Amino acid sequence: MAARHVIGVDLGGTKLLAGALGADDLTVIHRTSRPVLGLTQNQLVQMVADAVQEISVAVGGGIDAVGFGIPCTFDLRTGMAIQAVNLPLHDIAFADVMAPRLGVPVVVDNDANCHIYCEATVGIASGASDVVLMTLGTGIGGGLFLCGEVYRGWIGGGAELGHMVVDMDGRPCQGNCPNRGCLESVASGTALVREASLAVAKQPNTALGRALEAGRELTGPLITELANGGDPVALEALATVGRALGVGIANLLNIFNPQVVVIGGGVIGAGELLLAPAREVMRRRALSPAKDVVRVEAARFGPDAGMIGAALLARDLAAGRPTGAIEGRPA
């Protein structure tokens, strides 16, 4: 009899990360990563199906369910994607499309909900009843774990923390968001690259400037690499984004009084170069007692948290446990 598996898919604004877990542990048995930029909706759906099929073949089948984490707002009443800022998924009932295509039950949730489900149940915030999470990538995803459960809002539109306005007259937000001054416009991976680009144009004779002159692409990992080597432009870009993040954290502390704030996503590879300035601003702006007892931590599972959280939702679905997310089953 084939071993049983579940698959988790973390579909981001620039790439897909998917992996299979065994029936009982957190070991990622096989994984795949694929770019998603520039795809149409049909192309994206096909690419996702191909990635799941690749993993299924690699682990020898026995797939009980597939979980998806997607940076999108879903209407829990209809299963429709109603706000997909960085992906071509507007007005698609993703679970209903994927379940018959894959031939197994699927569960679909916002990607940050998957992140926080992982970190609050088996990760850095395990044991805490109230947790706030922000994932810093192309944009900023948000997740809330309140009173021991993922909070999604009345119809699924809750916890869009990246679209908290922190500057009423700030720069326009990205993608389909109509707002100005959203947190993700100043504290995301996109904002980090923008800050570094503006700074290096004024100070080209630095390690970052020389790296770009040599043909390296300006990315978050490059900025982190050179910041760790002491490059002043890279360090200041991370500190600028960290301070903006601290404003967002302070607002969330004043509203939710969580035990733990978890920061995940690709930008968290910068570690304390990002978190130290964030904590400093948070302590100046948040109120006591919330600011005095909170922990602000990097996600334990790093960039795998969304994928693992989606797989854990799939495991719940396969076991008949309530997921609170959108479920789909093959005909």
Stretch-by-stretch model annotation:
Residues 1-65, 75-78, 96-106, 120-128, ...:
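ATP-binding/phosphotransfer module of carbohydrate and carboxylate kinases, centering on a glycine-rich
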Residues 10, 67-71, 109, 133-139, ...:
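Short beta-strand segments
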Residues 79-90:
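A charged helix-plus-loop insertion that forms the helical arch/lid used to bind
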Residues 108-110, 116:
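Short loop/edge segments at beta-strand edges and connector loops
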Residues 115-121, 142-144, 163-165:
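Adenylate-forming
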Residues 153-154:
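A short alpha->loop->secondary-structure connector
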Residues 157-162:
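Structural signature of FAD isoalloxazine-binding scaffolds in flavoprotein oxidoreductases
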